[in-house]
C-alpha cells in the first residue's frame, strides 16, 4: 500500500510540475479561478434543482425566462474590471435557475430509477476531468481548429430539431442525443484550450470562461440523463412484457 501511495504521489507531482513548466503562473491562476467559479455555479445548479424537487421553491416558467435574460445579460454586460461581483452573481443566478428548469426532469427520473442521476453525474464528472486534462497536457492550440467544425455541427443539429418537430422521427431524436454528447465532449477540449489562449492574449474574464465550460457540462449532463432514462424505460417495459407472457 505504501509503495502504491508513493507511486501515486510521484505521478501527481510529475503532473503538477508538467503544468508548471507548460503554463505561466498567471495562466495557472486564471484557470484555478475559472474552475472554482465553475464548481460554485454547479453547486448553485444543484441547489436550484433540489429546492424544485422538494417543492420548497418552484419558479416554473419564470426560471426558463430568467435563464435567457441572465445569459443575454452576461453576454452584453461585458467585463470592465469593476463589475466582477455583479456578473458573478448573475452567473450564480443563471446556475440556480438552470437547476430549477432541470428539477422536473430529475423528479421524473427519480420515479423511474434514482441511480440514473448518479450515473449521469459520475459520467459527466469523469469525462470533464479527463478531457480537461487532455486539453491542458496536449500541444498548445492543438484543438482550436475544432471551433468552426463544432459550430457547423451545432447548426446542423438545430436544423434537424426543427425538422423533427414536424416529422417526429425517433431515429433523429436518438441520433441527436448521442451526437450531442460527443459534440459537448469536443467543446470541453476546445473551450479549455481557447480559455488558455484568451488568457495569454489579455482576456481574463473569469465569469465568461466559467460560463462557457458550464454550458458544456450542463448540456452533456442533460443528454446523458435522457439517454440513460430511455434505456431504463426500455428495460422496464421488456420486464413487464415478459411477466405478462
From Swiss-Prot:
Spell out the protein name for this chain: Bax inhibitor 1
Give the record's membrane topology: Multi-pass membrane protein
One of the record's GO cellular component terms: endoplasmic reticulum membrane
Its GO biological process annotations read: apoptotic process; autophagy; calcium ion transport; cellular response to starvation; cellular response to unfolded protein; endoplasmic reticulum calcium ion homeostasis; negative regulation of apoptotic process; negative regulation of apoptotic signaling pathway
Source domain of life is Eukaryota
The places in or outside the cell where this protein is found are: Endoplasmic reticulum membrane
**For this UniProt entry, which segments traverse the membrane?**
31-51, 56-76, 89-109, 116-136, 143-163, 170-190
This chain's function reads: Suppressor of apoptosis. Modulates unfolded protein response signaling. Negatively regulates autophagy and autophagosome formation, especially during periods of nutrient deprivation, and reduces cell survival during starvation.
Similarity section: Belongs to the BI1 family.
Kindly indicate whether the keyword Oxidoreductase belongs to this entry: no
Q: Where is the signal peptide?
A: none
**Which regions face the Lumenal side of the membrane?**
52-55, 110-115, 164-169
Q: What molecular function terms (GO) are annotated for this protein?
A: calcium channel activity; endoribonuclease inhibitor activity
Q: What happens when the gene is disrupted?
A: RNAi-mediated knockdown induces autophagy in larvae under basal and fasting conditions with larvae showing an increased number of autophagosomes. Decreased larval survival following treatment with tunicamycin. Impaired pupal salivary gland degradation with pupae undergoing autophagy prematurely by six hours after puparium formation. Increased adult survival during nutrient starvation.
| InterPro entries, sorted | Bax_inhbtr1_CS, Bax_inhibitor_1-related
Enumerate the Cytoplasmic topological stretches.
1-30, 77-88, 137-142, 191-245
The UniProt keywords, alphabetically, are: Apoptosis, Autophagy, Endoplasmic reticulum, Membrane, Transmembrane, Transmembrane helix, Unfolded protein response
Name of a matching Pfam family: Bax1-I
The protein's matches in CDD domains, at most eight in alphabetical order, are given as:
BI-1
Provide the coiled-coil residue spans: none
- KW Transmembrane (keyword) present: yes
Q: Which organism is it from?
A: Drosophila melanogaster
Amino acid at each position: 500500500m505504501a509503495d502504491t501511495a508513493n507511486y501515486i504521489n510521484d505521478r501527481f507531482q510529475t503532473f503538477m510540475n508538467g503544468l508548471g513548466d507548460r503554463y505561466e503562473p498567471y495562466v495557472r491562476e486564471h484557470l484555478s479561478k475559472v474552475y472554482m467559479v465553475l464548481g460554485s455555479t454547479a453547486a448553485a445548479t444543484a441547489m436550484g434543482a433540489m429546492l424544485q424537487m422538494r417543492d420548497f421553491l418552484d419558479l416554473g416558467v419564470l426560471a426558463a425566462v430568467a435563464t435567457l435574460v441572465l445569459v443575454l445579460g452576461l453576454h452584453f454586460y461585458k467585463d470592465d474590471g469593476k463589475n466582477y461581483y455583479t456578473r458573478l452573481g448573475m452567473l450564480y443566478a443563471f446556475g440556480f435557475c438552470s437547476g430549477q428548469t432541470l428539477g422536473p426532469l430529475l423528479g421524473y427520473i427519480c420515479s423511474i430509477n434514482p441511480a440514473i442521476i448518479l450515473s449521469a453525474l459520475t459520467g459527466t464528472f469523469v469525462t470533464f476531468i479527463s478531457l480537461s486534462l487532455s486539453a491542458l497536457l496536449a500541444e498548445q492550440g492543438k484543438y482550436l481548429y475544432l471551433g468552426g467544425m463544432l459550430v457547423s455541427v451545432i447548426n446542423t443539429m438545430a436544423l434537424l430539431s426543427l425538422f423533427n418537430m414536424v416529422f417526429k422521427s425517433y431515429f433523429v431524436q436518438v441520433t441527436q442525443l448521442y451526437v450531442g454528447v460527443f459534440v459537448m465532449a469536443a467543446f470541453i477540449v476546445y473551450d479549455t484550450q481557447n480559455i488558455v489562449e484568451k488568457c495569454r492574449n489579455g482576456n481574463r474574464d473569469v465569469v465568461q470562461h466559467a460560463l462557457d465550460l458550464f454550458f458544456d457540462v450542463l448540456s452533456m449532463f442533460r443528454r446523458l440523463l435522457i439517454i440513460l432514462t430511455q434505456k431504463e424505460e426500455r428495460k422496464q417495459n421488456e420486464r413487464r412484457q415478459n411477466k405478462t407472457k
